[in-house]
Curated annotation (Swiss-Prot):
GO biological process terms, semicolon-separated: amino acid biosynthetic process; aromatic amino acid family biosynthetic process
Organism phylogeny: Bacteria, Pseudomonadati, Aquificota, Aquificia, Aquificales
UniProt KW keywords: Amino-acid biosynthesis, Aromatic amino acid biosynthesis, NAD, Oxidoreductase
Superkingdom, natural source: Bacteria
Family label: Belongs to the archaeal-type DHQ synthase family.
Database matches in HAMAP family: Arch_DHQ_synthase
Keyword Metal-binding (UniProt): no
A Pfam family annotated for this UniProt entry: DHQS
Protein name listed in UniProt: 3-dehydroquinate synthase homolog
Molecular function as annotated in GO: 3-dehydroquinate synthase activity; NAD binding; oxidoreductase activity, acting on the CH-NH2 group of donors, NAD or NADP as acceptor
């Protein structure tokens, strides 16, 4: 996920507060002795000579004036985060640096520059560092960064089998965000084939809507989390990051507020996309819904063979939640 840092020089408590409210991941403070003042404002990563991340060690700043500086920025060890700045990105193309290293953060002066930095070479920089004391600009950049989240190509899965099972343990994921119609989480028996399980945004005569919730399914299943990784549903706990996707494949990060494991009657659902078979095990209840290609939810109690729902397919296998190229057969 993209990161948003705010450069605070000279130190200004109000700018730190605005950065925190705008969703900044960190503040960069070149001055020593300000860490405690920042922590009084709120919990945020401080990048400073005496900060959570040490400026000059964990994070380095490079002013790019020519090819020599560009080469120096590219040569830092992979674990070092590099902040780069230049007076004119049209003279020193950002593409060159993005192609050479992952942990790259570009200094920007406004929202327009942030937009360009995040989109360069499709993948863009790891994050932007805003050098501006304009409160509105800080808020604008925060909004832009939050919108530049993961985008997946969702596929249409044709349902081939629906089989009621006995009781099993399922995980209900309550997030700290309100989800909308057409949004949900990607889960599946295999990380290579997942279904978009819809959030509980719909009301019915018996149960009120719970738009913060996704009843995600059986404890053994995979769920997609940030940075192209997966977790088992049973691993989720309060404070964990999870991905929420809409029916167009646009992803955003939210956090688990509570993960409830309860014993419930379960349902095996199988489907096919081209020559690939996918499956998931969900609770057998009217409130559990998958997502149609147009974004409307469909209850598992109404689902039938031949229906089409949304999902995601990838070819690589997983090793400790990370994508790897290897042969894995899951049945």
């Amino acid at each position: 996920m993209k990161e948003f840092w705010v450069w605070v020089e000279p130190f200004d408590r109000k700018i730190v507060s605005v950065a925190l409210e705008a969703g900044a991941n960190a503040v960069v403070i070149p001055e020593k002795g300000r860490v405690e003042e920042v922590k009084k404002v709120g919990r945020i990563t401080v990048i400073a000579p005496d900060g959570d991340l040490k400026l000059g060690e964990d994070v380095v700043y490079v002013l790019i004036k020519g090819k020599e500086d560009e080469e120096r920025a590219a040569k830092y060890p992979p674990n070092v985060k590099v902040i780069v700045e230049t007076t004119d990105w049209t003279v020193i193309p950002l593409e060159n640096l993005i192609a050479q290293r992952e942990e790259l953060y570009a200094v920007v002066k406004n929202a327009q520059e942030a937009e360009v930095a995040l989109q360069t070479l499709e993948k863009g920089v790891k994050g932007v560092v805003l050098k501006s004391r304009d409160i509105n600009e800080i808020k604008k950049v925060g909004q832009i960064v939050s919108e530049h989240e993961e985008k997946l190509e969702l596929v249409t899965i044709k349902i081939t089998k629906i089989l009621p099972l006995g009781l099993g343990d399922r995980v209900c994921v309550d997030t700290i965000s309100l989800l909308h119609r057409g949004e949900g989480m990607l889960v599946g028996n295999s990380s290579g084939g997942m279904f978009l399980v819809h959030a509980e945004t719909e009301e019915n005569p018996y149960v009120a809507a719970r738009p913060f919730r996704v009843n995600a399914g059986a404890v053994h299943m995979y769920i997609r989390v940030p940075n192209n990784r997966t977790k088992y549903l049973c691993e989720l706990k309060a404070g964990d990051k999870v991905m929420v996707y809409d029916y167009k494949g646009r992803g955003r990060v939210t956090y688990v507020g509570r993960a409830k494991v309860e014993r419930r009657p379960m349902l095996l659902i199988e489907g096919r996309y081209e020559n690939k078979k996918l499956s998931c095990i969900l609770q057998n209840a009217e409130t559990i819904r998958l997502t149609k290609p147009d974004g409307t939810p469909i209850s598992v109690s109404e689902l039938k063979e031949g229906d089409e729902v949304l999902g995601y397919v990838e070819e690589a296998g997983r090793h400790f939640g990370m994508k790897v190229e290897e042969t894995i057969i899951e049945k």
